[in-house]
Amino acid sequence: VGSEMCIRDRLETALCLCANGVKVYLFDALRPTPELSFAVRHLHCNIGVNITASHNPKEYNGYKVYWDDGAQIVSPQDKEIIAEVNNIEDFSMVKTMDKDAAIDAGLLNVIGQEIDDAYIGELHKLVMNPEEIQKAGDLKIVYSPLHGTGLKPVTRVLSELGFKDVHVVEEQAVQDGNFPTVKSPNPEGAEAYALSLELAKKVGGELILVTDPDADRLGMYGYDSKNNEYKEFTGNMFGAILCDYVLMQRAQSGRLPDNPAIVTTVVITNMVKEICKKYNTFCDCNNLIGFKNIASRMRAYEQTGEHNYVFGLEDTFGCLPGTYARDKDSVGTLMLLCEAAAYYKNRGMTLWDRMVELWQEYGYYKEKVQTMKFDGREGAAKIQSMIQTLRDNPVQKVGTYSVEKIYDYKLGTETDAATGKSEAAVLPKSNMIYYQLADGAWFLVRPSGTEPKIKFYLGVKGTVSYTHLRAHETRGNLV
């Protein structure tokens, strides 16, 4: 059992489990979510629980449950657990016990430094070019934990690897669940970078990195030396850079396994697919949104031996660079980004320069998510009506792009837009519709699984300026 902020809730959860005869390992202090995922595997636990608000505003809280492989639960476990919760008719039915009694009974076991050491040790194994880090140890890194749990593991692993010029945003280094310096500590929002950008300009930072409060997601800005400005990286962008870097380094050193696979989701940038082709690596991308679905594929590989997992990523700023855990890990991701930055610095380049090179090699890809929110029961009904309308009345165009094929993940069908002919397709079950568009573009619509929102995802490809303009034009037409 661990938590990102809520100390009391962590202990209450542990004592409830102890009262039901369950042996519990309880972290002695706040820890990152990926470390809990690692600990479940390391300690051979049956389940893990993390109490966290994650990147949400301070009013929110969450209860993440992990299975014995360290992955967040999927069906049927999720439905079975919530059914038990709904069976509670009165809070007096919930058992608890005294902390000292639980310790004396051998049910409550406090863990800490030994798990930290084992976790950091696994991250060290991921480093591919330690000599590159030593040559560029003066890389100026600006880092903010956004009042969360990333501070200790991030600064520790960077220091141990030899990065000597790390500048922490002190105002955001204090763990505080009220997140006093930001409205929402979300790496996807520009607000989260205000203090980091200010510090970077002051110290001449080359790389700006932030982790969300439970340290599973990462955000990044990189320095553009040609224009003397900082550029924002989306999750798709730094995910593509890492896919390219990891596959390139492993291929060059002979460390790429047989039948390698990059695992991602259906809304990832198509650039990742092109990078995988270059390195003869399977891009496992027909997966539902959410990192638990990536973890599910990792488990399948272990059972079948069909592929060997190399790297996993999703568009929402989450990556897992190894098999030591089963949830996205900003600490390991940040570490590899810093290694890649050192590698390119030794060649007179920044990560922004490398991003431009990737665009020049594979084409300019741009992705965007548009969200519409509808509150209450009427809002929920409106969302379902919107997606059903799209299902019942197939569109021929999305903005200025012609529709070529329509994949309905709820019905399990593939439809040719020109002929209207449909046939069965092997698709994971979900209430979403994917449109394959002309010119390498795509569009997906789905209701959010956690909020009263409907989400529209768009990906386009082309020349830099032309694609940028068409992307904005299409988003406007969608809304």
Predicted regions and their residues:
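Generic C-terminus detector
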Residues: 454, 458-470, 475, 479
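Conserved small/polar residues in nucleotide/adenosyl-binding loops
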Residues: 1-9, 467-474
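Phosphate-binding and adjacent anionic-ligand microenvironments
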Residues: 206-207, 229-231, 249-446, 453, ...
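Short acidic, glycine/serine/threonine-rich loops at helix termini
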Residues: 8-12, 37-41, 59-65, 152-157, ...
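Gly/Ser/Thr-enriched, mixed-charge loops and adjacent short helices
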Residues: 61-194, 198-200
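N-terminal small/polar loop signature for handling phosphorylated ligands or for N-terminal nucleophile
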Residues: 8-60, 164-219
